[in-house]
UniProtKB/Swiss-Prot annotation:
Residues 267-416, 854-906 are annotated as: Disordered. Belongs to the formin-like family. Class-I subfamily. This is Formin-like protein 18. Residues 1-25 form the signal peptide. It comes from Oryza sativa subsp. japonica.
């Protein structure tokens, strides 16, 4: 909305709010004000009939003319109306008439009381005050925006500007002020004629403008609007108006300094002819300022110069800088150089021709002044030196650094013909001439190395050349190949084919005739098989085969074989079946033997008996005692139960007992006695020796029954029995060797392998009966496949039956030791036995080492018991039976000594 409309609306609202309702001539305004914003307790004095009409009518009245006519017509119209209504809207603007709309509505409500009317009056006054303050603020903001928008710094236009220098003004300063004509409204033809016609008059102090209001405001006439204040503000300044592309519409004439009131005139405009562009060169310097007396002397104004080049106006004055251009413009062509005669003349140089395209001004900012023209040396002082041209010679930089004498000497000594070797990274030390060093004693010719040898061993040039050549060749090969397969797939396939050294013709012949192929090659071809899309692209490829990569060439040569990958699967099955079937059969045989060994081992049963009796003895009197069997997992817990000495475990005790019993049994079996009699123990023989010694001690007549030599013989015999028993117990691991092998098998893996063989055989049979029969070919592959299927059916069927039988056998073996638990534990029984055999072997080694230590200590023992006790304390394990034998030997020696003493007394 225009600022004038804001002012008119504010004036009308203030008139409605502030006009007294009893003022003569403005009674209608007061009445409208009272009925619009607040109601009174009594009817209006001047409009008594407005509040008693019940029917609703709407009448619009237009009041024309001046104020008297408006009041007269409004008064007559109100008195003439039949009813009364409420004035709802009043509008006024410029030349548009004031429109008053009187609405009549039904009057069915009763009259309000005086107390309600007073409350409404207070509310209405408050609302009116708030509205008045709001309107005043809006008007203030609108006026402020109007002033800020009229500032010369905010009026921006991207069009070129035309500058006029005011040479005859009192000041040399210039101010670039842009005037936007659209902000003031369109100029009428009258104003344009007045502006153009007033150029020659020169005696007008004021200029009248007839502004045409825009369509939205109404028909307004603004006659006799004085621009004297604006002209006074713009006096002695340079005024820049907006011009079109190569055409000037309006110009502002210069202002006379002697006039009392500055007048605004315009100079005649016209078409500016475009001069041909001069040759390219550096941007021209700014023209020099003219002396103040130049125009007064000659009596005419100088012609306007062309627009200054970019940057020329920066130092011309202190006025507002022009806005930056929207797009960068080319610099203006240079003016022709003035002649020497013109340089010394009093008049300024002729203006240069204007450029073909107006040059845009530079963005605001200080900059160095341009250099003076060639002819301005005699008229004024010189300016700063011109800046360096973009294409001119650059300034010389600092001189390059000089090399150190050592580096220069090393570079001079370097022979370009020598081969380049690998670098040897070391720390160089600079020799100090003032200090004696070891390096001073090294002579130059004391050592000579073989140059050829060092070049052959540590040469770097040949390897780099080879690597670069290889990279170039590989790059050339990679660029000329057509890739169809996936890059990773093609790379892996090419590597496998190169490693196996197999051609596509060999693979094609093997697939068609049924020849043997390496299983690795078949697995590679099946694994990196192309997708359906890649296979279709290989079949439809019509280019040169040499343009394909190695993998693509190989696959394209064999891809047209019917049922290629079904044939490869059949060949792989035919190659893998014998080996896989043999491995499965070997595993089944091992499992069967392991079950038989575990169930028929006498020594293993003896071990279980010893553990059962020992456990019942230790658990006697508790709920754990009286057991008749135990799970084989208990064997792994024997090594965890230790004796009071902290060294002997329960497993050690059980092994010692089994060694003793098995030693006597082995000795009697070797001597041929004890066929059906019960095996006597070592302890019974020891007791017999002890009884014999006691009887010899008690009877004086039989003092010579047992001597020391016989006791030593018995001890040696006992040690021999122990060694025999230790060998029998240690051989348990060898007797259950197949059990250890069976523990490494996986029952589920064996079952899956056998099932896979059967499934692949069924698949090969289906391919033979459907796919190959549809081809109706009599090839070597078909004949071999038929023979293979017929022979393999019996073998695979037998493997399936063996798998079922061995599963039942393993289940029966587990039940034989653990009972019918109803849980399928697989081959876990063999795993437990294997782990126990490992612990048993460790204990047998410890017992053997202890026996060797005891034999060595027996040889080195002294007559006194102290060394024996000390030796026994040093041992890691002490056999209780050895202690019994030592006590018996001591008793026999005491008996012999007492017998000899009694004989001497006699």
């Amino acid at each position: 909305m225009s600022k004038l409309r804001w002012l008119i609306m504010a004036f009308l609202v203030c008139l409605l709010l502030l006009t007294p309702k009893d003022l003569e001539g403005l009674q209608l305004v007061g009445a409208i004000r009272n009925h619009l914003f607040w109601s009174t307790s009594s009817p209006l004095h001047h409009l008594p009939d407005l509040l008693e009409e019940e029917s609703v009518q709407v009448n619009e009245m237009e009041l024309w003319g001046d104020d008297d006519g408006r009041r007269r017509m409004m008064g007559e119209e109100v008195r003439r109306q039949a009813g009364a209504g409420r004035m709802s809207e009043v509008k006024m603007g410029g030349d548009r008439p004031l429109v008053a709309v009187i609405k009549k509505e039904k009057h069915g409500a009763k009259k309000k009381k005086d107390d309600d009317s007073s409350g409404m009056v207070v509310v209405g006054l408050s609302a009116a005050c708030v509205a008045l303050v709001t309107l005043v603020g809006i008007c203030f903001c609108a006026c402020r925006d109007s002033e800020s928008s009229s500032s010369p710094y905010d009026l921006r236009d991207e069009k070129p500007l035309l500058s006029l220098n005011l040479s005859d003004g009192p000041s040399r300063k210039s101010c670039a002020t842009t005037i936007d004509v659209s902000r003031l409204g369109a100029l009428t033809a009258e104003c344009e004629q007045h502006l153009h016609g007033g150029a020659g008059a020169g005696d007008h102090n004021t200029t009248n403008y007839n502004l045409r209001k825009p369509a939205g405001v109404g028909s307004m006439s603004m006659n006799k609007v004085s621009m004297q204040s604006q002209a006074m503000r713009m006096s002695s300044h340079e005024i820049t108006t907006i011009a079109g592309a190569g055409r000037v519409e309006n110009k502002v004439s210069t202002i006379a300094p002697s006039a009392a009131a500055a007048a605004v005139a315009s100079a005649g405009g016209g078409q500016v002819p475009a001069a041909p562009p001069p040759p390219a060169g550096p941007p021209p310097p700014a023209p020099p300022p003219l002396p103040p007396s130049h125009h007064h002397h000659h009596g005419h104004h100088p012609p306007p110069p062309h627009p200054l080049p970019p940057g020329a106006g920066a130092g011309a004055g202190t006025g507002a800088p022009p806005p930056p251009p929207a797009h960068p413009a080319a610099p203006a062509p240079p003016p022709p150089a003035p002649s020497p005669s013109a340089a010394g003349a009093g008049s300024g140089p002729p203006p240069p021709p204007p450029p073909a395209a107006p040059a845009a001004p530079r963005p605001p900012g200080p900059g160095p002044g341009p250099p003076p023209p060639p002819g301005a040396a005699g008229r004024g002082g010189g300016g700063p030196p011109p800046p360096a041209l973009p294409g001119g010679p650059r300034a010389r930089g600092p001189p390059p650094f000089k090399k150190s004498p050592g580096a220069a000497a090393a570079a001079a000594q370097a022979d370009p013909n020598k081969a380049k070797l690998k670098p040897f990274f070391w720390d160089k030390v600079t020799a100090n001439p003032n200090q004696a060093m070891v390096w001073d004693q090294i002579k130059a010719g004391s050592f000579q190395f073989n140059e050829e040898m060092i070049e052959s061993l540590f040469g770097a040039q040949s390897t780099e050349k080879k690597s670069t050549d290889a990279k170039k060749e590989s790059g050339k090969e990679a660029t000329q190949f057509v890739r169809i397969l996936d890059p990773k797939k093609a790379q892996n396939l090419a590597i496998s084919l190169k490693a196996l050294s197999v051609s596509a013709e060999q693979v094609r012949a093997a697939v068609m005739e049924g020849h043997d192929l390496p299983p690795d090659l078949i697995q590679t071809l099946v694994r990196w098989s192309p997708t359906s899309d890649e296979e279709l692209r290989l079949r439809l490829y019509a280019g040169e085969p040499a343009q394909l990569g190695p993998a693509e060439q190989f696959m394209r040569a064999i891809i047209d074989v019917p049922y290629l990958y079904q044939r490869l699967d059949a060949l792989l099955f035919m190659a893998a079946l014998p080996e896989e079937a043999a491995a499965v059969e070997q595993s089944f045989a091992t499992l069967e033997v392991a079950c038989e060994e575990l169930r028929g081992s006498r020594l293993f049963k003896k071990l279980l008996e010893a553990v059962l009796k020992t456990g019942n003895r230790m658990n006697d009197g508790t709920f754990r005692g009286g057991a008749q069997a135990f799970k084989l997992d208990t064997l792994l817990k024997l090594a965890d139960v230790k004796g009071v000495d902290g060294k002997t475990t329960l497993l050690h005790f059980v092994v010692q007992e089994i060694i003793r019993s098995e030693g006597v049994r082995a000795a009697r079996a070797a001597s041929g006695g004890g066929g059906g009699s019960s095996i006597s123990s070592i302890s019974s023989s020891d007791d017999l020796i002890l009884l014999q010694s006691q009887s010899s001690i008690g009877s004086n007549s039989g003092r010579s029954s047992v001597d020391a030599s016989s006791l030593e013989q018995e001890q040696d015999e006992t040690e021999r029995y122990r060694q025999l028993g230790l060998g029998v117990v240690s051989s348990l691991g060898d007797d259950l060797q197949n059990v250890r092998k069976a523990a490494s098998f996986d029952a589920d893996a064996l079952t899956i392998t056998v099932a896979s063989l059967g499934h692949r055989l069924v698949k090969a049979n289906e391919f033979l009966s459907t796919g190959m029969r549809s081809l109706e070919e009599d090839s070597g592959f078909q004949r071999r496949l038929a023979s293979f299927v017929q022979q393999s059916q019996e073998q695979v069927t037998r493997l399936l039956e063996d798998e079922k039988r061995l599963r039942s056998l393993v289940r029966a073996t587990v039940d034989y030791f653990h009972g019918s638990t109803g849980k399928d534990e697989g081959l876990r029984l063999f795993v437990v036995v294997r782990d126990f055999l490992g612990i048993l072997d460790k204990v047998c080694r410890e017992v053997k080492e202890q026996a060797a230590a005891n034999a060595k200590a027996k040889k080195q023992q002294q007559p006194t018991p102290a060394p024996r006790s000390r030796q026994s304390s040093q041992s890691s394990f002490r056999d209780p039976r050895q202690q019994i034998q030592d006590r018996r030997a001591a008793a026999l020696s005491r008996n012999n000594s007492s017998s000899s003493s009694s004989d001497s007394d006699d």
